Amino acid sequence: MAKQIKGILGEKLGMTQVWDENNRVVPVTVVKAGPNVVTQVRTNDSDGYESVQIAFGEIDPRKVNKPLKGHFAKADVTPRRHLVEIRTADASEYTLGQEITAETFEAGVKVDVTGKSKGKGFAGVMKRHNFKGLGAGHGTQRKHRSPGSIGGCATPGRVFKGLRMAGRMGNERVTTQNLTVHAVDAEKGLLLIKGAVPGPNGGLVLVRTAAKGA
């Protein structure tokens, strides 16, 4: 059964620390949330499911193709750089062109934050998959950080799909779940979220109502 999901696109500004009411230091990530605009509303009657599409970020109109220009014109909004669709049971309550700001969330609520992790380049199995590696003594000959066996010679006689090996690390879509919104600065459009969120400073993040827990 679908539930009511709130969401907003924003930019990760970086981390800092603040003090709570008990005078304890709280590490927080500052996210400049929105403003977003609603560019499309999907309903059960027209699309078979309910969702709302929101847009964020400035873009030169000359860089927008004709189909997208028509899409934004239909919603009577200027072109935006990023689009995302959020499935929610109350999609019909949204209207085209409606603005969504940081006030969507309140302090104390649980959220999931999605972003693109920092790219680390080509990495070995110890860094990429937390392998233990081989022995550190002199008896191990130049194989200290190798993965070990990747499959038998005759049986199975091949390398299984999905076997963890060296390769490019990071630059992937990552979601951190059940983070707490510590504070909301509605005037500046900022969300202060406890803990770290994926991605570099300046990266795009999606803040949504937590799928699990509360």
Curated annotation (Swiss-Prot):
One of its GO terms (cellular component) is cytosolic large ribosomal subunit. The keyword Ion transport does not apply. Disulfide bonds: none annotated. One of its GO terms (molecular function) is structural constituent of ribosome. One of the primary rRNA binding proteins, it binds directly near the 3'-end of the 23S rRNA, where it nucleates assembly of the 50S subunit. Part of the 50S ribosomal subunit. Forms a cluster with proteins L14 and L19. Belongs to the universal ribosomal protein uL3 family. This is Large ribosomal subunit protein uL3. It comes from Streptomyces avermitilis (strain ATCC 31267 / DSM 46492 / JCM 5070 / NBRC 14893 / NCIMB 12804 / NRRL 8165 / MA-4680).
